[in-house]
Amino acid sequence: MLPEEKNTFYITTPIYYPSGKAHIGHAYTTVAGDAMARYKRLKGYDVFYLTGTDEHGQKIQAKAKERGISEQEYVDEIAEGFQELWKKLEISNTDFIRTTQDRHKTSVEKIFEQLLEQGDIYLGEYEGWYSVSDEEYFTETQLEEVYKDENGKVIGGKAPSGNEVELVKEESYFFRMSKYADRLVEYYNSHPEFILPESRKNEMINNFIKPGLEDLAVSRTTFDWGIKVPGNPKHVVYVWIDALSNYITALGYNTDNDTKFQKYWPADVQIVGKEIVRFHTIYWPIMLMALDLPLPKMVFGHGWILMKDGKMSKSKGNVVDPYMLIDRYGLDALRYYLLREVPFGSDGLFTPEDFVDRVNFDLANDLGNLLNRTVAMINKYFDGEIPAYQGNVTEFDQTLVDFKNNVVKEYEGSMDHMQFSVALNQLWSLISRTNKYIDETAPWTLAKDEDKRTELASVMTHLAENLRIIAVLLQPFLTRTPGEIFLQLGLQEENLKKWDSIYGYGEIPAGTTVVKKGTPIFPRLEAEVEVTYIQDEMKGSAPAPAKEAAEVEALETPQIGIEDFDKIDLRVAEVKQVDKVKKADKLLCFQLDLGEGKLRQVLSGIAEFYQPEELIGKKVIVVSNLKPVKLRGLMSEGMILSGEKDGKLSVIEASSALPNGAKVK
């Protein structure tokens, strides 16, 4: 759980490497950090939110040379692109650090000198396999693929990333990592929330610390675009000290004006992609230990946004341009999708279908319709004025208030644990419950009976009040929609928009005037048209195919032997019952008859493609010997096979002539 003991809050993203245009992956990390920064500000914290760019290195030097411009001109151009995207995303960062800035360079030089003087850095020689793309050395055993000559000598290979490596031998300064290994493990054990999710910590210990930490090369001589090592200018400070130290140099560490450093350090949470967790939870804390500085309270390693065919790549034609999504669908649609669709900490899949569905079902239908109906009814029944709050009048009022109180409590717990998708799911349950309240109270019926006027007024005040609270809870995630809700409800007092106001009820002054005619905050999209549009835009950067693509993509999966296939037990099953899974938009819970004398429960992510009643009685094919797994608190004992086309799943049906439990061969 994030710390609550002080009124400052320091949060960082990684500094991004400007070797290309900012994309949706960068947007994901930075929007997540922005949501947490906005949440903490709402709760009264003095927040410092840092992001920036890592602008030194061999790859930058090579890119600038290709363009025929200086390194500084190159990074200035790319850094400006990142800052433009943050502005477009309305990121509320406090500062933007660039490693080419003098404030950073001066502090890095002092850090290097201190570590050298106290013996944590020494001069030696390094020989190893180096990847220019990764800007990292690898031992032979770490290589994903090794190339050998006819004599069996290793002459090259590929890094774990798939990038080519070359043998490099050079003089280098080294950091004594092993000196601090035991102390680091002790810190892990005494601070269980230092690395989250938990799986990341286990990976660091088992894969990197237990095998033994090797001393780390922290300077380079094969390129010169970087900060010169004090007293030995043929060396430049390597990324581990140069880039990682930005989190303290941005605060004025080791300068005459270190007020911000004294105020905000240590960081409360540092958000990083899972591919750089090692650098931030091994190299970075060891460096801080050597400098005798406190460690960050938490490093949170989030997953990747993937496409159906893997990571984004221009060659695959699956690159998602955040500018395109913002310009066509609005900023809040993108911010909502990024933080609702993917559980923070796990990998997630971007599909045009899911994006359009989120806009239509969640934003336009659930939230938009609730606001439209409420404003319309207040205009129709009370001449546009919100009635005075009179407590709980109808039999449904107290239930609605209790539900709100519970959601607020759950929401805060989820946000404090960086579980953004869970918090949004809880918030949407309040939106759904408020929509249900309209159906329960039937204000159109109450309006026909003058004796029910008090009840009708109570319904209107409860609807307006819930919408006000929903708008407050939306503020960490969406930058424009909350203001539009406040505007349509006629809420001008700032106190009604503050965090503390959500704990009470009936805060809206009687007689507050709503707008005469509300406008849809999220117009409904033509699903098929918009899915096609996004798909075409994603393909726009792909090179022209060598020949017309086949109707079905060629499989690129590795071949297996019959002995591997025989391990899979496929059985025919009859669908006896299907239910929707609460708080899980995509899951259906099946009760299947596999001829075992009892029904077997299997969960499948096909809820968006079928209504439960469509599936009852069908014969399906099930992987029956799959290891049971718990999903959303429900046990799933198998997998139902489906086929996929154009993003839509279709259950593979078996012949009705086959008995339940028949083996599929």
Swiss-Prot record:
The keyword RNA-binding applies. A motif ('HIGH' region) lies at residues 16-26. Its EC number is 6.1.1.10. GO terms for biological process: methionyl-tRNA aminoacylation. The keyword tRNA processing does not apply. GO terms for molecular function: ATP binding; methionine-tRNA ligase activity; tRNA binding. Residues 564-665 form the tRNA-binding domain. Keywords: Aminoacyl-tRNA synthetase, ATP-binding, Cytoplasm, Ligase, Nucleotide-binding, Protein biosynthesis, RNA-binding, tRNA-binding. One of its GO terms (cellular component) is cytoplasm. Its main location: cytoplasm. It comes from the Bacteria. Coiled coil: none annotated. A motif ('KMSKS' region) lies at residues 311-315. Pfam families: Anticodon_3 (PF19303), tRNA-synt_1g (PF09334), tRNA_bind (PF01588). It catalyses: tRNA(Met) + L-methionine + ATP = L-methionyl-tRNA(Met) + AMP + diphosphate. It is found in: Cytoplasm. ATP binds at K314. Homodimer. Belongs to the class-I aminoacyl-tRNA synthetase family. MetG type 2B subfamily. Is required not only for elongation of protein synthesis but also for the initiation of all mRNA translation through initiator tRNA(fMet) aminoacylation. This is Methionine--tRNA ligase.
